[in-house]
């Protein structure tokens, strides 16, 4: 079984990474939504020194994110905010596709805004659930059909150097169907890296519904519960996870479970009972891989989080 961490400021240290490997970590995810692969040469060098063997890059793909902010924003309930021109930067496709009355979920649903007015180049919204918003955080609009390309220009640049950087697998966000996988396969071939593993992230209802058509085309499925939980009432997410797990098992396709596995360990040295139970059950469901994201990238206890992930999973094996 594979255990992945996510590299970030909290673990960007050779000794910490080595301790995570000693705890059982078998690979690292690098999130390229926050910067291109070429800009992370220092992290790549750290991973080599620490003896990390597997490196997954998480592309931008058709994912919606806000742009760069001069500084983080503190948003409060009832506040009016603009997304688009003269406001929080966001994709033009979002502005052109969303209607008044629809909701916007930001940062995996931590913040919620309602669209009041749709202008030609901006959305005027009211904050329903406030919080701190940082650059490049995710955006989701339940029920909206927003057409985004499978790969961005930056994604293709990252793929062109992936093999030389030691990348072993590519994670494609928000897979909507077989066409997305074929586009990535073609891009990998053009980049001279046809042997890299493809991991399809299921993060919306389109991906859930299209799973049977692209299952034969991928090396692994990623049940990415953050944005997937924004696509449905949250109480339906556990059932969806179980159904996706069963479909992958039946097809003989490996699958990974990710997002908030040990979320409390951002700030606590010991996880909750619910979190370790979640890990244990994911293994019983047949998961071939588990991954930590913010727990290792930005949390206070990256090594301890990896220890709990590995030890709990191995107890279930």
Label every PLM stretch briefly.
Residues 1-317:
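Non-catalytic helical/linker scaffolds that mediate oligomerization, partner binding
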